[in-house]
Design a protein with these regions (language model features):
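Charged docking surfaces used in two-component/phosphorelay signaling
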Residues: 92-99
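Short secondary-structure boundary segments
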Residues: 36, 115-116, 145-146
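Small/aliphatic-rich secondary-structure junction motif
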Residues: 2-55, 84, 88, 104, ...
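A structural motif corresponding to the C-terminal end of an alpha-helix
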Residues: 72-89
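Structural alpha-helical scaffold elements that stabilize or flank donor/cofactor-binding regions
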Residues: 101-104, 133
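Glycine-rich, Arg-bearing micro-motifs that act as flexible, cationic patches
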Residues: 110-135
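A short acidic, glycine-rich active-site loop
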Residues: 53-72
């Protein structure tokens, strides 16, 4: 059963999206997949003169630490909504958040994201990830607005 996918980046908007998606998963008895995507490291411009091999490990991203942090957030939100938690899978990835969520949407009944994320620039109406997944996801998309 595909279920619900929710994108989480640690922002308040994504936390609200996570809580909403959990409630929906409980209500409809479907599994929930929580995905957090960390941006791929940008190679310094000095590589033009001193190339760095592509297979050099990135020391700034620790997938196990990221997975544990995401699981901690999921557990905390599950306690706050005080409902029986649905079947939850957590997943972390390195790359472009919109691209990863669009790819994941191919196997989902619904994709849930917050209206704005933790990016440095805010768009007029929606964050860039929520805007991109709205246009390219393979399943229905729910955009959760921030609290007031």
């Amino acid at each position: 059963m595909p279920g619900i996918i929710v994108g989480v980046d640690g922002s308040d908007h994504s936390r609200l999206a996570l809580a909403w998606a959990m409630r929906e998963a409980v209500q409809h008895h479907v599994p929930l997949t929580v995905i957090s995507v960390h941006p791929a490291p940008v190679r310094p411009a000095t590589q033009i003169f001193w190339p760095v091999p592509d297979d050099l490990p990135d020391r700034s991203y620790d997938p196990e630490f990221a997975r544990k942090a995401l699981q901690g957030l999921v557990d905390q939100v599950a306690r706050e909504i005080a409902e029986t938690a649905p079947e939850i899978t957590v997943s972390v990835a390195l790359g472009d958040a919109a691209e990863e969520l669009v790819n994941a949407s191919r196997d989902a009944d619904m994709l849930v994201v917050g209206s704005r994320g933790s990016g440095g620039f805010t768009r007029l109406l929606m964050g860039s990830v929520s805007s991109q997944v709205t246009h390219h996801a393979a399943c229905p998309v729910v955009i959760i607005p921030g609290g007031r």
